[in-house]
Amino acid sequence: MAKADKATAVAEIAEKFKEATAAVVTEYRGLTVSNLAELRRSLGNSTTYTVAKNTLVKRAAVEAGVEGLDDMFAGPTAIAFINGEPVDAAKAIKKFAKDNKALIVKGGYMDGRALTVGEVERIADLESREVLLSKLAGAMKAKQSQAAALFVAPASQVARLAAALQEKKAAGDSAESAA
């Protein structure tokens, strides 16, 4: 690879690091081209799965200000640059790695820090953003319903008390008139 090509490749990878919301570093040794194509399809349009030389990726990471990933760049390395929802991409990678033992997750990068394999797996185990938001909305709605019931309860108790007093008074008046 010519020096100009290397510089271009480093710049492209650095730009991907800068634009990505997260990145997952994997080892793809033993995967076929069709396996890699299947993985790329499963990741969707918001994730780019890039195979590159470790030295170029290290330089690009330094250029992008990404730290803590150097130990992960050993052996055949590929990086999933996630531009969308990190949970969805992590789930897809975890599922693919489960089905294809040759894919090994080495770690990742998100929110300005390196992630361990365990942290990437925990992200994959999270529910999607939409599910979490709907659960939050449901919890908020339930709390509002409880609050409304709490505010209505004293008024309904007063109304029942007034009705009971009125019945008692009516019963007392009818008892006096009968006597």
Swiss-Prot record:
Pfam families: Ribosomal_L10. One of its GO terms (cellular component) is large ribosomal subunit. Gene3D superfamilies: 3.30.70.1730. GO terms for biological process: translation. This is Large ribosomal subunit protein uL10. HAMAP family: Ribosomal_uL10. NCBIfam families: PRK00099.1-1 (NF000955). Belongs to the universal ribosomal protein uL10 family. It comes from the Bacteria. The keyword Ribosomal protein applies. InterPro entries: Ribosomal_uL10 (IPR001790), Ribosomal_uL10-like_sf (IPR043141), Ribosomal_uL10_bac (IPR022973), Ribosomal_uL10_bac_type (IPR047865), Ribosomal_uL10_CS_bac (IPR002363). Part of the ribosomal stalk of the 50S ribosomal subunit. The N-terminus interacts with L11 and the large rRNA to form the base of the stalk. The C-terminus forms an elongated spine to which L12 dimers bind in a sequential fashion forming a multimeric L10(L12)X complex. Forms part of the ribosomal stalk, playing a central role in the interaction of the ribosome with GTP-bound translation factors. Keywords: Ribonucleoprotein, Ribosomal protein, RNA-binding, rRNA-binding.
